[in-house]
Every structure is written in C-alpha cells, then in structure tokens.
Amino acid sequence: MITVRLPVSLRTTADDVLHVGDEVRSIADLIDLLDRQVPGFRDQFEQGGFNVAVNDELVIHGVHDHEVHPGDVVEIFPAIAGG
C-alpha cells in the first residue's frame, strides 16, 4: 500500500491521507487516480500547481515516470513561488 498525503484543496474527505494499492506504480498513475476523484486535478498539476515528494525527497525531474512502491509515502503540496 502507498500512502498519499494531500493538501486541503484536494481532499474529498476530512482525512488528509489516501491509501492506494498496487494499481499505482508511478506518479502518472497517481495523477490519473486523483483526476478521477478530484476533477481538474490533472490540469492544475500540469500547469505547475503542485509539487511532489516521495519519501521526503522532492521529485523535480521526470515526475510522471517516477516509480512508487508499496510502503512509499507520496506528498502532494501546492507549488509556492516567491523571491
């Protein structure tokens, strides 16, 4: 099982954690799953609205192809810009 931590804007329940099974093998699979649960998520993600970390490591390059495995913790959080 993979644990996915979600920001408030993506929660479909009061819980901030989603558990997904073997059907999710990559961040691309996770994006597909979340887009079915939260319509418009894919568009927001593709426009740079969110960042992804897997096991506390920020995924910067090749996000869609990044593999996830049982026991991983994936965090999706809003992208923040500033200077």
Residue positions per predicted region:
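Ubiquitin-like/PB1-type beta-grasp interaction modules and other compact soluble beta-rich domains
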Residues: M1-G82
